[in-house]
Regions:
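Conserved short alpha-helical segments that host acidic/polar catalytic motifs at enzyme active sites
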Residues: 1-210, 216-279, 284, 373
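Flexible loop/turn segments at secondary-structure boundaries
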Residues: 12-14, 102, 168, 177-178, ...
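PRPP-dependent phosphoribosyltransferase catalytic core
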Residues: 165-167, 172, 202-206, 363-474
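Active-site proximal loops enriched in glycine and acidic residues that flank catalytic Cys/His/Asp
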Residues: 172, 193, 219, 282-286, ...
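Phosphate/diphosphate-binding loops
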Residues: 197, 204, 212, 267-273, ...
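Hydrophobic, well-ordered secondary-structure elements that form the walls
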Residues: 265, 295, 351-352, 374
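Long, K/E/R/D-enriched contiguous segments that form extended
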Residues: 271, 276-317
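Short, glycine/charge-rich flexible loops or terminal/linker lids adjacent to PRPP-binding catalytic cores
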Residues: 297-345, 384-396
Length: 474
C-alpha cells in the first residue's frame, strides 16, 4: 500500500511534512521518501528503507539537513519514490499511488514506438513511477499527460508532482479509488491521504479532490485544472480495514463506520437465530476492535480484550512479503489476559479473513490459553478476488485466499461458477464454506458480514463503492 503528505507554504515546511508522513506509517513498512523545493537550492530528494527502522528514526537527520517551502513525502511498499525527473517540462518530482496491471504492454510500447529508456530500477525491474512520468511526458503539459495516463492504464494512479516553480499538481485517480484531501492554513495548503493529519498540523479542511480531478496548489490558492468526472469507485476496504480510525473519506468516518458495521452484524445474527451464548466479545486488534465494540453494544454482551497486542516495537504484520515473517510477527506481539480466556466462551470479530493463516494462529493461541469456545465473525464478506486496482494485500495469487481454497477443496474449480452462493451464508454452498473454515481453523462458529450490511455501514451509495474483491464486479 502507501500514503502521502505534502505542503506548499510561504515558509519552511519540512517539520510539517516530517510529521505528516510519519502519520501515514500504518500504510507501509518498506520504503519512505521525501522531495522538496527551495528557491535557492532547487529540488532535493531522499529515499530510504524503513523495513527495520521506523520512519521517524530513519528520517530524523534527513529532515534536519533539508529545507524547502514545498515538499511531498510518502510511504511506499512498491517502488522507491518520489523520483526526480528532467523532461521537456523541466525538472520535477513525481509520486504515484495505485496499481497499474498492464505495465508490460506499456513498457513495450514505450521501447518500440518511442525509443525511450529508463534509468530507475527496482530489483532489476523498471520503476513504475518512472514509467508514469514517461507517459505523462508524451503530451504537451502535465494536465494532458495525466489524462493520457488515465486513458491507457489498467488499474489506478493518483499522481502528485512538484513543479520547478514550487507549485504542486495533484491528480486523484480516474475513479477516485483512494482519497486526496486538501487542507488550508494561513501560510499555505497541505494535501494528504489521511484526513486527520491535516487537523493535527493546523490545517482546516478545504477540499476533497474529485475522481479524475487535477488541481494546482500554490501557497496562495488551489486551482482546478481539470474537473474530472462524477463517477466514483472508492475502495470500501478503506473503512473496514486499512483506513485510520480518526480519518474520514467522502464525509464518512472510519471509526463510526466500524461501530455501525459491528452493530449490523450482531443484528443479523439475532435475526438469523445464530447469536451465540458467549461470555465476551473481543476484537482482533487493531482494526477488528471497533467492529467488535459495535457488535458487543448491539448484542448486549460485554466487550473484553482477551489478548493485547504489544505495539511499541512491532509494526503491522500484514505488510511483510513472506508468510513466515507475517506469522512470526503476529505471534510475537500477542499477549494473553488469561483471566479473560480460561474457561470462557469468546466471540471475536476480525476486520477480514484473507489468507486465514494468522487468524488460525490467533485461535490456537486462545485455545492454548484455556478458551472453552472461540466463535469468529468477519467484518466483511468472504474475499473472492485479488484487487486489480490497489496494492493493499501481500497476496500474489488468488489461491492464497482462504475462500477460494475451500471452494476448490469442496468441488474443484467448477465451484467458481457459484461464488455468489458461497458468499451467502443462507445457501447450502455458503453453509459448507463456513463449516469447512470452522473445521480447518477450529472455530466454534463463523459468519461473514454481508455485502449489503457493509455498504449500509459505510453510508455511501453502492454505485460509488468498489467491491471488486468480494463480488468480482468492476
Amino acid at each position: 500500500m502507501g500514503g502521502f503528505f505534502g505542503v506548499v507554504s510561504e515558509r519552511d515546511c519540512m517539520d510539517d511534512v516530517f510529521f505528516g508522513i510519519d502519520y501515514h506509517s500504518h500504510l507501509g513498512t518498506k520504503l519512505a521518501g521525501v522531495a522538496c523545493y527551495d528557491k535557492e537550492i532547487g529540488l532535493q530528494r531522499k529515499i530510504h528503507s524503513i523495513e527495520n527502522i521506523p520512519f521517524r528514526t530513519r528520517f530524523g537527520q534527513v529532515f534536519d539537513d533539508m529545507k524547502g517551502t514545498t515538499a511531498i513525502g510518502c510511504i511506499s511498499d512498491v517502488d522507491p519514490q518520489p523520483l526526480l525527473i528532467r523532461t521537456k517540462f523541466g525538472a520535477f518530482a513525481v509520486y504515484m499511488l495505485g496499481k497499474i496491471t498492464n505495465t508490460d504492454k506499456l513498457i513495450e510500447i514505450f521501447f518500440n514506438e518511442i525509443n525511450g529508456h529508463f534509468d530507475a530500477k527496482t530489483g532489476g525491474k523498471i520503476n513504475i513511477t518512472e514509467l508514469v512520468a514517461a507517459i505523462i511526458n508524451q503530451k504537451g503539459n502535465f494536465v494532458d499527460g495525466i489524462r493520457h495516463l488515465n486513458d491507457i492504464i489498467e488499474g489506478s494512479a493518483s499522481i502528485i508532482v512538484i513543479k520547478e516553480d514550487g507549485n504542486i499538481i495533484a491528480a486523484r485517480d480516474r475513479l477516485g479509488r483512494l482519497p486526496v484531501q486538501i487542507g488550508k492554513r494561513e501560510d499555505g495548503f497541505a494535501l494528504s491521504f489521511e484526513s486527520f493529519v491535516l487537523g493535527k498540523l493546523g490545517f482546516e479542511p478545504y477540499k476533497e479532490v474529485k475522481p479524475g480531478e487535477i488541481v494546482e496548489i500554490s501557497s496562495k490558492e488551489v486551482t482546478t485544472l481539470y474537473e474530472g468526472g462524477e463517477q466514483m469507485k472508492i475502495c470500501a476496504f478503506l473503512w473496514s480495514y486499512y483506513g485510520y480510525p480518526t480519518s474520514s473519506y467522502e464525509g464518512k468516518n472510519v471509526e463510526l463506520m466500524r461501530y455501525e458495521n459491528g452493530r449490523i452484524m450482531a443484528q443479523a445474527d439475532k435475526k438469523e437465530g445464530i447469536a451465540q451464548d458467549i461470555d465476551y466479545v473481543g476484537g482482533v486488534p487493531d482494526s477488528g476492535t471497533p467492529h467488535a465494540i459495535g457488535y458487543a453494544n448491539e448484542s448486549g454482551k460485554s466487550f473484553a480484550r482477551a489478548f493485547i497486542k504489544y505495539t511499541p516495537t512491532w509494526s503491522r504484520s500484514f505488510m511483510p512479503g513472506t508468510q513466515g515473517s507475517r506469522n512470526k510477527i503476529a505471534k510475537m506481539k500477542m499477549i494473553p489476559v488469561k483471566e479473560l480466556i480460561e474457561g470462557k466462551k469468546l466471540l471475536f470479530v476480525d476486520d477480514s479473513i484473507v489468507r486465514g493463516t494468522q487468524l488460525k494462529e490467533t485461535v490456537d493461541f486462545l485455545y492454548e490459553n484455556g478458551a472453552k469456545e472461540v466463535h469468529m465473525r468477519s467484518a466483511c464478506p468472504p474475499i473472492m478476488y485479488n484487487c486489480k486496482y490497489l496494492d493493499f494485500s501481500a497476496s500474489r495469487s488468488e489461491m492464497e485466499l482462504i475462500a477460494r481454497r475451500i471452494i476448490v477443496e469442496l468441488e474443484g474449480e467448477e465451484g467458481f461458477k457459484y461464488m455468489e452462493e458461497y458468499a451467502d451464508g443462507k445457501t447450502e454452498r455458503g453453509k459448507k464454506l463456513r463449516q469447512s473454515i470452522c473445521e480447518k481453523f477450529h472455530f466454534a462458529s463463523l459468519e461473514f458480514q454481508s455485502l449489503e450490511g457493509l455498504i449500509q455501514a459505510i453510508g455511501l451509495e453502492p454505485c460509488k463503492l468498489c467491491t471488486y474483491c468480494w463480488n468480482g464486479k468492476e
